A protein has these predicted regions:
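Bacterial Sec-dependent N-terminal signal peptides
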Residues: 1-25
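Extracellular interaction modules
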Residues: 6, 114, 140-141, 166-169
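Residue-level detector of functional hotspots within protein domains
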Residues: 7, 26, 34, 160
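Aromatic-patch recognition
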Residues: 29-157
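C-terminal partner/receptor-binding element of secreted or periplasmic proteins
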Residues: 147-181
Length: 181
């Protein structure tokens, strides 16, 4: 009898656990602001694909018809944004969400070379390049953009300038500190 009750209890716990896990699922927001639930998976070569709830196949996520998508399992959020000096939109991964959002553009090319560019925007405004691993472009301009974004917090601005570290981690931590105030 005890074994029977334990089995029932175990099944009930497992059912409750799996029903909660299913409730947290991937989603895509299209250009009409409709939220579509489903499953998102990353291709080995290429980008992410989406299968709507009840659908049978995964399709490439169309950039011109999408605002953002979120992959629950990896907590990855991509938004469609037009980068400065570009005319067509790209998917940018949102690294930090708050008063200042931090986005990452990542492109891999042959020979294990990759480009990482971080952009920031304040209150969903214009994107500014704040950090990059490229040798092109002015580091001073990127720093100035970062300083302008946090200028309304003089204490943080002074601390950031004084630390004189402009690594990817330092930029991310500064934005997190700004957002926490």
């Amino acid at each position: 009898m005890k074994l029977y009750l334990r089995s029932i209890l175990c099944c009930a716990v497992l059912c409750a656990f799996f029903s909660q896990v299913k409730a947290q699922q991937d989603f895509l927001i299209n250009s009409k602001n409709d939220t579509l639930k489903g499953e998102i998976k990353k291709q080995f070569i290429g980008f992410y694909r989406f299968k709507p709830e009840g659908g049978t196949s995964f399709n490439k996520i169309p950039i011109r018809e999408t605002k953002e998508f979120y992959k629950v399992e990896k907590e990855i959020n991509y938004l469609v944004k037009v980068r400065p000096d570009k005319s067509s939109p790209d998917f940018l991964q949102r690294l930090v969400k708050g008063k200042i959002d931090l986005f990452e553009y990542y492109r891999q090319s042959g020979n294990n070379q990759y480009v990482v560019i971080w952009y920031a925007s304040k209150q969903n405004g214009q994107l500014f390049e704040v950090k990059s691993n490229q040798i092109f472009g002015s580091r001073k301009e990127r720093k100035d953009s970062m300083y302008n974004l946090i200028a309304d917090n003089p204490g943080l601005l002074e601390k950031f300038k004084k630390d004189d570290s402009y690594s990817f981690e330092a930029v991310k931590e500064c934005i997190k500190l700004y957002n926490s105030n």
